[in-house]
Each structure stands twice: as C-alpha cells, then as structure tokens.
C-alpha cells in the first residue's frame, strides 16, 4: 500500500480504479518557411477555429457547472484575441520566417513565464490558461482532435494538473475523484470538484507512472489522503465509512 498526502478540496470518500492522465509531451519544431504571410493566414484560421471551439465548451460548461464556472472559456477567448499575444505570434513568424506552431509555442511559453512570476495569485493562475490556449492552437494547426472525451470508464483521475478544457471534456458521470500533483485550492480543477461535489486533492506528490495507473485507489477527502493499492483492512474501513 502506498499513501500520499495532498490538500483536500472537497470531502468525501472515493474508491475505484486509478487512471493516470498525461498530456502529450509535444515537441514543436522550428521550421523555416518561404511564405510568412501564408503562415500568418494559417494562424488566423486556427485562431478562428479555436474561438469557435471555446464557444462550444462554454455552452457545455454552462449546462454542467453553471455560468460562473464556465466563464473561464470566455476568458480564454479574450486571451486568444489579445493584441499582445497576437502581435508576438506575428512578430516571430515574420521576423524569423518560421512556422506558426513554433511562434504560438514560443509566445505561450513567454507569456506563461511572465504570469508565473507575478505576485498576485489570480494572475499566476493565468499561466495555465495561456498554456491551454496555446496548446489548443497548436493542436488545430497540426490537425489533431481537440474534442475527444478523455475518460471512458469510472475512475479516479490522477494528473500533474488539469486545464479547464480537459476537465470539461471528461464524462462527469465517470469521474470518481480528481487528484493532481500541482494546482491550488483556487485552481479550475478544485473549483470544478467543489461544483460536482466529489472528493478531490491538489498538491499531492505522487508518481504518475505504472506504480499508480490501473491500481485500486481510495481518496479520503476528509484528511487529504490517497491510498494506492490499499490493504484489506484499510479498504474495509473506508468502504464502511462510505456507507455510514
């Protein structure tokens, strides 16, 4: 049995299979292009698609978690249309003569670093948002599927962190709990967990590998603990608590 301690977002007990969710570690290549204007056109087309996709996610989130929590997707739309963000992408494409994917990735990294260095907690949270919109744009430019469901069976979802677009694309009926390595009590994952009224932990230092993935897990939201591959005594005690 492995035991990890995190910060509890919402109380309660969840018992089920653990699924480790990992983002694709995308390596964006810097490619010289002959026609920067054509590359800018690709970016503008991707941006239009991205804004439309975020509108769909906003409507979905409104139905599932309410307008207040869905508003983050309107924020993402505004960030995608932000003059500073767009001017940075354009400058990199035209001054360096490179592909749109590289320009978006570089801009996203630069803006995320800027937000992460800020003193205000709210502004630091925006680093994850700018990474999310940049990843969406890169996925569109690459022709990837950005709307696929991320979970197909009931499970405790364990991840490094989860972006708003990732949480809203999950089948809520199959999410037993959220557990993230990073994230704060004010993160989007935490807010969603409270809205869904499911046990959840953030700031939990557990490995995201085969020692956890697929194992039986217990999330104890009362004290911020996750048990991986629990012994029979612990499992019986938690099952009893859940029925009380």
Predicted feature residues:
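Non-catalytic, soluble scaffold/interaction modules
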Residues: 1-244
């Amino acid at each position: 049995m492995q035991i990890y301690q995190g910060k509890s977002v919402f109380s309660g007990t969840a018992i089920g299979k653990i699924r480790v969710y990992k983002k694709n570690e995308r390596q964006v290549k810097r490619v010289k292009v002959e026609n920067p204007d054509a590359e800018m056109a690709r970016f503008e087309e991707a941006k239009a698609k991205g804004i439309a996709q975020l509108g769909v996610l906003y409507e979905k989130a409104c139905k599932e978690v309410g307008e207040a929590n869905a508003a983050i997707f309107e924020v993402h739309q505004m960030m995608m249309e932000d003059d500073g963000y767009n001017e940075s992408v354009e400058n990199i494409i035209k001054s360096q003569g490179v592909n749109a994917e590289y320009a978006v990735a570089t801009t996203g990294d630069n803006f995320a670093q800027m937000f992460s260095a800020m003193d205000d907690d709210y502004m630091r949270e925006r680093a994850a948002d700018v990474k999310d919109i940049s990843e969406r744009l890169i996925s569109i430019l690459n022709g990837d599927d950005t709307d696929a469901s991320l979970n197909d069976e009931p499970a405790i979802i364990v991840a490094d962190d989860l972006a708003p677009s990732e949480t809203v694309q999950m089948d809520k009926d199959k999410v037993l709990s959220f557990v993230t390595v990073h994230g704060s009590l004010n993160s989007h994952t935490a807010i969603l967990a409270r809205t869904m009224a499911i046990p959840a932990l953030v700031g939990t230092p557990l490995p995201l590998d085969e020692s956890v993935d697929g194992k039986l897990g217990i999330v104890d939201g009362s004290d911020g603990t996750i048990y991986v591959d629990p012994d029979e005594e612990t499992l019986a005690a938690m099952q009893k608590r859940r029925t009380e």
